[in-house]
């Protein structure tokens, strides 16, 4: 009985290992065809270019257009010039104290 359950467990493990190999194989970064190799090369190249935190493959016209758009958005939404317009706003909602007897806000 014990040996049969062990054999059954081994079969399940072998099946799972075979299924999961298809998921793990791309993570090994070994390309099986030229197109996959080109894709991996482009991903690595993009990662290196975007490490500085700036736009990838930008020119002065694109950077000027980005600055113009950020200035327009800042003017439209009333930015004080110190607020980072690329960051999601933080909302603060104060807790309302409720009187437990009358259930009315104070």
UniProtKB/Swiss-Prot annotation:
The keyword DNA damage does not apply. F-type ATPases have 2 components, CF(1) - the catalytic core - and CF(0) - the membrane proton channel. CF(0) seems to have nine subunits: a, b, c, d, e, f, g, F6 and 8 (or A6L). Keywords: CF(0), Hydrogen ion transport, Ion transport, Membrane, Mitochondrion, Mitochondrion inner membrane, Transit peptide, Transport. This is ATP synthase-coupling factor 6, mitochondrial. GO terms for biological process: proton motive force-driven ATP synthesis; proton transmembrane transport. Belongs to the eukaryotic ATPase subunit F6 family. It holds the Pfam family ATP-synt_F6. Gene3D superfamilies: Mitochondrial ATP synthase-coupling factor 6 (1.10.246.110). Transmembrane segments: none annotated.
């Amino acid at each position: 009985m014990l040996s049969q359950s062990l054999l059954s467990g081994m079969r399940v493990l072998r099946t799972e290992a075979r299924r999961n190999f298809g998921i793990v194989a791309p993570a090994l970064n070994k390309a099986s065809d030229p197109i996959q190799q080109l894709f991996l090369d482009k991903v690595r190249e993009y990662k290196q270019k975007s490490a500085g935190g700036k736009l990838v493959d930008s020119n002065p016209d694109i950077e000027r257009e980005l600055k113009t758009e950020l200035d327009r958005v800042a003017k439209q939404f009333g930015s004080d010039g110190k607020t980072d317009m690329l960051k999601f706003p933080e909302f603060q909602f104060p807790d309302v104290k409720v009187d437990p007897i009358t259930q009315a806000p104070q």
